[in-house]
A protein has these predicted regions:
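Glycine-rich phosphate-binding loop
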Residues: 124-150
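ATP/nucleoside-binding phosphotransfer catalytic cores, i.e., glycine-rich phosphate-binding loops
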Residues: 185, 189-252
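Glycine-rich N-terminal segment of FAD-binding domains in flavoprotein oxidoreductases
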Residues: 26-52
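N-terminal glycine-/serine-/threonine-rich phosphate-binding loop
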Residues: 1-32
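Ligand-binding beta-strand-loop-alpha-helix segment within the catalytic cores
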Residues: 56-128, 251-252
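Class I SAM-dependent methyltransferase SAM-binding "motif I" and its flanking Rossmann-like core
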Residues: 140-184
Length: 252
């Protein structure tokens, strides 16, 4: 895995957006794997800027999001579809029909999961998958213990994940307890992976991912099995790394 340490969150967003924009420029029909949560917001802001100021063209691209809460309609303000519209889709020229987010309120959730896997496969697979990392090392909503063979499925959210996401809801009781999530196998099927982490609260998970063994107990560590992973962290998220000193030259 390639490690890039940047000064702060602002630099992280710029660096990540640059990598994604390079993919769009080199392959206009790129298939993007996208993430939600707090960390990618800066990257999306920079991508919008690149689209507006440098005419980065998303018109032939397509996207697949990692996950969606079970039970939330696409119109719910805390759905990940609503997040994507607000933070990216409404501001770039990516056609609506080219964007894919799991349907959290589907009548048949198992069929929705199977159809999502089929759609990714029929698109030719994901070219570049953007990930965040949870405090417990989760990627997507693949919580500790997730199988390396897992594909898109309905998952139970852990207490720690529910607590971490409660800040987006009026109360913790409103946070869904299940989600549809791409599996570890689905994520590892992407041609490239870019994982972003910011802040001291992510430092332990980043250390375990990069310096620990590849284990289902830390789902992000399973990325060690992937041939093309770039990890971009700010100095706070890198604060527990013993290898950090060797990567000082990677700062931008």
């Amino acid at each position: 895995m390639k490690l890039i340490i940047v000064k702060d969150y602002g630099e992280l967003g710029k660096k990540a957006a640059g990598l994604v924009a390079d993919e769009v420029k080199s392959n206009p029909k790129v298939v993007l794997g996208l993430a939600t949560g707090g960390t990618p917001v800066g990257m999306y802001r920079e991508l919008i800027k690149l689209h507006q100021e440098e005419s980065i063209d998303f018109s032939q691209a397509s996207s697949f999001n990692l996950d969606e809460y079970v039970g939330l309609a696409a119109t719910h303000p805390q759905s990940y579809r609503a997040y994507m519209q607000e933070n990216l889709f409404d501001h770039i020229n990516l056609p609506a029909g080219h964007t894919h987010v799991p349907t959290g309120d589907a009548a048949d959730l198992q069929q929705e999961c199977a159809s999502y896997e089929t759609a990714i496969r029929e698109a030719g697979g994901i070219d570049i998958q953007v990930l965040g990392i949870g405090n417990n090392g989760h990627i997507g909503f693949n919580e500790p213990g997730s199988s390396v063979e897992s594909t898109t499925r309905v998952v139970q959210l852990t207490e720690s994940t529910i607590e971490a996401n409660a800040r987006y809801f009026a109360s913790i009781e409103e946070v869904p307890t299940q989600a549809i999530s791409m599996g570890i196998k689905t994520i590892l099927g992407a041609k490239k992976v870019v994982l972003l982490a910011s802040g001291e609260t992510k430092a332990e998970a980043v250390r375990l991912m990069l310096e620990g063994e590849a284990t289902a107990d830390v789902p992000a560590s399973l990325l060690q099995h992937h041939p093309d992973v770039t990890v971009i962290v700010d100095e706070a998220a890198a604060s527990q790394l013993t290898v950090a000193a060797a990567n000082k030259e990677d700062k931008r």
